[in-house]
């Protein structure tokens, strides 16, 4: 009898441990105000007439672009951006970047985590990417609610480039604005430790972009955003080395403010802070006012 009780006790101890472990590994829920609080030391929040409350980083140069201070790695969710900037855990995985004619690059908060939010271009010699601006239609199409922003126009070309959701899947028609793109030689992509330093100089982008094709391939599978883009085997052939596939694991117990590396790599595991963001119809600005998003 005692042995049976002991066995039952051990069973429930193990079971409770598994439950606690699963709870510890589950994503936490936080309010979208988290972005305001944690990004304020690194940049300013301002109201935008079209996008609501937007954020702009301090201490970046006049020629800075998003997705340059870091590197690309292959993961179970496709290509993931490993940022070296202390605010990169938020701005490259949630929300979208937009180039504003008056403000420059601004970031719009979002609620869905992804390995990166970029469009991809590829040619035999080069691989490039460009930040994806917000587009309501695209997110509804793949089952993700982003926000109620209007479709965005880039006004830097003779023809306006409107981001309909079809373009994210069409490999031939969509061409991103040249000034927003970053290109790496294909033999350097996937293993160079600093994408911005290995990038092709801007004056060559027009020719490179003209000779490339769109390979953007974003999917929503099992409640996760998958960022495929450049073919993994093509990258391995060009670089002559096998890619490491990183497992993405939730990291919930983190100190955000003052941390240089919120997300960390250990072996083949990439520990990321990616809480589920709860939407709020109002978000604070730096002047402590509120306005509808």
Q: What positions do the PLM features span?
A:
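Low-complexity segments
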Residues: 28-287
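Classical secretory targeting signals
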Residues: 1-27, 290-293
């Amino acid at each position: 009898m005692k042995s049976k009780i002991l066995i039952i006790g051990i069973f429930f101890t193990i079971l409770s441990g598994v439950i606690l472990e699963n709870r510890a590994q589950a994503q936490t829920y936080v309010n979208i105000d988290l972005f305001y609080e944690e990004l304020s030391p690194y940049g300013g929040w301002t109201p935008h007439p079209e996008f609501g409350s937007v954020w702009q980083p301090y201490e970046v140069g006049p020629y800075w672009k998003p997705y340059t201070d870091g590197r690309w790695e292959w993961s179970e969710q496709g290509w993931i951006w490993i940022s070296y900037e202390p605010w990169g855990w938020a701005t490259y995985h949630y929300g979208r970047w937009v180039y504003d004619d008056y403000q420059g690059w601004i970031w719009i908060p979002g609620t869905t985590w992804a390995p990166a939010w970029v469009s991809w271009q590829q040619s035999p010699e080069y691989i490039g990417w460009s930040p994806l601006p917000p587009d309501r239609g695209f997110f509804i199409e793949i089952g993700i609610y982003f926000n109620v922003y209007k479709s965005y126009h880039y006004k830097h070309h003779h023809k306006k480039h409107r981001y309909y959701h079809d373009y994210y899947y069409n490999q031939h028609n969509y061409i991103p604005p040249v000034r927003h793109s970053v290109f790496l030689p294909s033999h350097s992509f996937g293993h160079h430790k600093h994408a911005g330093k290995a990038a092709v100089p801007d004056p060559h982008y027009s020719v490179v972009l003209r000779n490339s094709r769109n390979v953007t391939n974003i999917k929503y599978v099992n409640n996760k955003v998958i960022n495929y883009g450049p073919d993994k085997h093509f990258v391995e052939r060009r670089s002559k080395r096998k890619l490491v596939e990183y497992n993405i694991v939730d990291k919930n117990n983190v100190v955000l403010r003052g941390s240089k590396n919120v997300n960390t790599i250990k072996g083949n595991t990439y520990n990321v802070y990616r809480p589920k963001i709860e939407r709020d119809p109002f978000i604070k600005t730096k002047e402590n006012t509120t306005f509808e998003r």
